[in-house]
Every structure is written in structure tokens, then in C-alpha cells.
Amino acid sequence: MHTAVAEYNQKINTNYRWNFFWMALDNMMFFFIFMGMSPYTILPYYVEKFTDSKILIGLIPTLYLVGTTLPQLVMANFLHSRKKRKKYLVAIAATQRMGILGVFLLSLLQPRFNISATLTLVIFFLMHTLQHVASGFYVPAWIDFLGKCIPRRRGFLFGISNFLGGLMGLALGWLLAFLLERYPFQQAMPVIFGIALGASLISLVSIISWREVVPPDELLPREADRTDSLGGVFKDRNFVQYLIWRGLMVTLEIATPFYALSALEILRVSAAQVGVFTTILAFSQAAMNPLWGWLGDKKGFLRIIQISALAGSLGAFLAVLVPTLPSYYAVFFLVGMMLSGLSISSINIIFEFSPKQLVPLYTAVSQIALTPLSSVVPLLGGVVAEQLGYAANYWLAGALGLASLLGISAAVKNPKGHSGEELKAA
């Protein structure tokens, strides 16, 4: 037993730098994909050209959140007894790219064949759903692979790759602004979506390049413990408290799809400002990610979640209290802080809460627990914005964001340093 485990750990260390590089490259490409297909700026701007419904605008981040959430428990159970998992990662990643390809082809063919607005929206939402449902199956396998192949300095990996990806994303943000300013909508959007597609293919090459080390039987969870393990997750009181307050924090998403649209509508600025907003969003993420990675490794990722909630709440209040263009620039910087902080923390905090062998299960439970709010919040935001206006939307987001910050600060103990120690929190 000890020999097999020692050989496994040796292979992990041998492949550590190789996997670190390719995982970092994959994560860097995420910035290009996310900027070119942002559910908070680019996609709402695209869909708005075909509908006046703010509810449909709110559906964009809803499908993004729900699609990446609901399949995770299914995938975690599927992976439970499977030793070789990389092949599933590659197959699902390829499916994700089919959704991105579909949106790209739609933007290219819609003006050429004069496809109706209704059919355009149907095809768009089908492709958008395909991409993010595939992401829901992908995430547990990816996090499990990450936890095994990168056993140390994960915060540094995310920090440095997000930083470099964000810097390159600044150039992309400038390009987005240039395209939207100088070229008609129907010419600019295929280029933007094409860049996202190209980045996704580089990401796919990175995923294929990862080296899987198959664990020995001794390190696999026993089938007899499967049901008990799921029950044990819910007996982890600290983790449950985290899920409750982190779930409320999702309400910050009520505002994010509408910041760019409200700026265009209220301030009467040009469409090129969507590219500027996206650039600021990328710059904020690039600037903050190294700090998040360092702080998470040192102090724990709960601290980053708290700071992110504060940034998101301040952004919402600023948008409603000081509706000027410079203020909106600050709003998007704060939103970038929030999104990057929550993104890097939502993954890495699982390793702090979970015993090593239960990471996919903890991941799935975490995401499933956040689904009810994450599924309705952007749609609720669309209803509020349509019926009561953007201001009511932003007041609600800011107030609930602050409430979640106070709750998580009071009720959740920092799990840093206690990974795998116990399932029940004191």
C-alpha cells in the first residue's frame, strides 16, 4: 500500500511543473473566452439588438449560473468510482466549444441570411445553454483534477495566470471598444465571438496536454462510504453556514447584467463604452488576482469572499447614487474585484473545507446549494429593472450584499488550515 501511494505521489511531483504550465495557460485563455462572451456586457449587448425584454437579458446570466451548477452533483456521483477521468474532461470541454462555435456562426450568418429576431434568440439561447450545461459537467472533474495534480500553491497558480490573462485581456478590451466604435454591429460581433472561439481552442489544447496520474485503489473513496460521505457533508456545520450566507451573496448578481445597459441608456454614451467597461472589468481582475492568490494562500479564501461582497455592494450603491461616467468606471472596477474574488475563492475554499477524497462531492454540494438563488436572481433583476427601474435593482443588490457580508462574517469560521481535519465544525 505505502509503495503504491509513494509512487503515485512521486509521479504527481514529476508532472507538477508540466501540469502547472498547461493549467495556467488554460486559465489565461478563460479571460479571452469570458471577455468575448461575457454574460454581463457583451452578450446582453448582443441580445438587446433583437429584443426589448429585460427579462430575456436577465436570462443570460441565469443560464450561465444554472447551467454550470445543476449537473455538478450528477457528475460528482459519476466520477466517484472512476479512476481514469481525463477522457471525460476532454469530451465535455469539446462540447463546451460547440456552444461557442454555435454563437459565432449565428453572429456570422444572421445578417447574411436575414434570420428573424425570434429564431436568432432561440438559436442563441440554445447554444448558450449547451455551453454552460457542459460547463456544469466539466467543473467537478476539473476541480478534482486540479486538486490532485496541483497539490500546493493553487492560489499562486490562479493569481499569476489570472494576472497574465487579465493583462492580455486589456488589449482585447481595447480591441472590443475599437470594433464597436468603428464597425457596424453586424461586423463587430463575429470578430468578438471569433476571438473567444479561438481562445477556447487554445484552452482545449491545454486540457488535452494535461498529464493524468491514476491514483492507486487505496486512495479512492470506498463505495460503502458513499452515502455516509454525502450525509457527512451536511453535518459539517461550518460548511452549511457558509453555503447559506454565500447563497444570499449571489443576490449581488441581480445588478451585474444591467450596469452597462443602464450606462448606455441613462448617460447616452456611445456603444464603444461597452468595450471600455469590459476593459476596466478585465483590468480590475488582472490587478486583483495576484493579491487574491497571495492573500488566499496566506489568510484563507473566506477573507477574499468578504472583501468581494463589500466591493460588489459598494459598486451597486455607487451606480445608483452617482450616475456619471467616471462613477460607472469605478463600478466596473469594483465589479471586477467582486467577480475575480468570488471566482478564485469559490473553487479554492472547497479545498479548505473538504477532506481530500471528498472534493468533488463538496464541490457539487456547494454549487447545488447555490442554485435556487442563482437561478432566479438575474431573472428577478430583469423584472425589477423592467417594472421599477435600474435604481431599485441596484439598491436591492447593495442591501442584500451587505447583509450577506455581515452574516458570513458572524456565522462562518475561517476553514483555513483545517482541510480534511473533520467533517463537523466546532
Please describe what each predicted stretch is.
Residues 135-150, 341-355:
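Intracellular juxtamembrane helix-capping segments at the cytosolic ends
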Residues 71-84, 180-181, 288-300, 385:
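Helix-to-loop junctions at the C-terminal end of transmembrane segments
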Residues 105-127, 320-332:
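Helix-loop junctions at membrane interfaces in 12-TM secondary transporters
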Residues 44, 49, 77-81, 104-113, ...:
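Transmembrane alpha-helix termini and helix-breaking/packing motifs in multi-pass membrane transporters
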